[in-house]
From Swiss-Prot:
<feature type="binding site">
    <location>
        <position position="113"/>
    </location>
    <ligand>
        <name>Co(3+)</name>
    </ligand>
</feature>
<dbReference type="InterPro" id="IPR023900">
    <property type="entry name" value="CN_Hdrtase_asu/SCN_Hdrlase_gsu"/>
</dbReference>
<dbReference type="InterPro" id="IPR018141">
    <property type="entry name" value="Nitrile_hydratase_asu"/>
</dbReference>
<feature type="binding site">
    <location>
        <position position="114"/>
    </location>
    <ligand>
        <name>Co(3+)</name>
    </ligand>
</feature>
<dbReference type="Pfam" id="PF02979">
    <property type="entry name" value="NHase_alpha"/>
</dbReference>
<dbReference type="GO" id="GO:0018822">
    <property type="term" value="F:nitrile hydratase activity"/>
</dbReference>
<keyword id="KW-0479">Metal-binding</keyword>
<feature type="binding site">
    <location>
        <position position="109"/>
    </location>
    <ligand>
        <name>Co(3+)</name>
    </ligand>
</feature>
<keyword id="KW-0170">Cobalt</keyword>
<comment type="function">
    <text>NHase catalyzes the hydration of various nitrile compounds to the corresponding amides.</text>
</comment>
<dbReference type="GO" id="GO:0046914">
    <property type="term" value="F:transition metal ion binding"/>
</dbReference>
<keyword id="KW-0456">Lyase</keyword>
<dbReference type="InterPro" id="IPR004232">
    <property type="entry name" value="CN_Hdrtase_a/SCN_Hdrlase_g"/>
</dbReference>
<comment type="similarity">
    <text>Belongs to the nitrile hydratase subunit alpha family.</text>
</comment>
<comment type="subunit">
    <text>Heterodimer of an alpha and a beta chain.</text>
</comment>
<feature type="binding site">
    <location>
        <position position="112"/>
    </location>
    <ligand>
        <name>Co(3+)</name>
    </ligand>
</feature>
<protein>
    <recommendedName>
        <fullName>Low-molecular weight cobalt-containing nitrile hydratase subunit alpha</fullName>
        <ecNumber>4.2.1.84</ecNumber>
    </recommendedName>
</protein>
């Protein structure tokens, strides 16, 4: 296993095949006047530079320091995220799952790769692998171990299956020793993987 891609697997098509298919579809849409190349470039720039797990990290940091916001986030995640200017396509209906000392939540999309884009950006390749989609349900502790996290035996692992209608993400536990951290410092500890639930935030000593 590698640090960058703990879950091994492949997609039904190679990256080269997928890229070629996307380019062909773009060309058809542009030729038919359904979309412009400028619009495609703009959307690519947004998801590469403006949308990503850094937004989810800021929301988590706010929840860690503001109990009232945390309650709103757990009650109506979509609305609470909008308070911080986060929302939109692929995040119309979101639910946030709180990790505790006795429960660890982990998110998967067993059907395809449904994912809360406004909060986490584009999904990593491993999230789309059939191996992850199957093993997250069948052997969640084994998958977590491959990501370097081993919950205590008495911690309940809950698996949540995202769909096109409802997308889940995780509110991790706040690391110990961060009582005097600012929101910005706390956000730096939150990783994409911890928001999916396959890992936990970075500890202050490792940040």
């Amino acid at each position: 296993m590698t640090a960058h891609n703990p879950v091994q697997g492949t997609l039904p098509r190679s990256n080269e095949e997928i890229a070629a298919r996307v380019k062909a579809m773009e060309a058809i849409l542009v030729d038919k006047g359904l979309i412009s190349t400028d619009a495609i470039d703009h959307m690519s720039s947004v998801y590469e530079n403006e949308v990503g797990p850094q937004l989810g990290a800021k929301i988590v940091a706010r929840a860690w320091v503001d109990p009232e916001f945390k309650q709103r986030l757990l009650t109506d995640a979509t609305s609470a995220c909008r308070e911080m200017g986060v929302g939109g396509m692929q995040g119309e209906e979101m639910v946030v799952l709180e990790n505790t000392g006795t429960v660890h939540n982990m998110v998967v999309c067993t059907l395809c790769s449904c994912y809360p884009w406004p909060v986490l950006g584009l999904p990593p390749n491993w999230y789309k692998y059939p191996a992850y989609r199957a093993r997250a349900v069948r052997d969640p502790r084994g998958v977590l171990a491959e990501f370097g996290y081993t919950p205590d035996p008495d911690v309940e692992i809950r698996i949540w299956d995202s769909s096109a209608e409802l997308r889940y993400w995780v509110l991790p536990q706040r690391p110990a020793g961060t009582e005097n951290f600012t929101e910005e410092q706390l956000a730096d500890l939150v990783t994409r993987d911890s928001l999916i639930g396959v890992s936990v935030p970075t500890t202050p000593s490792k940040a």
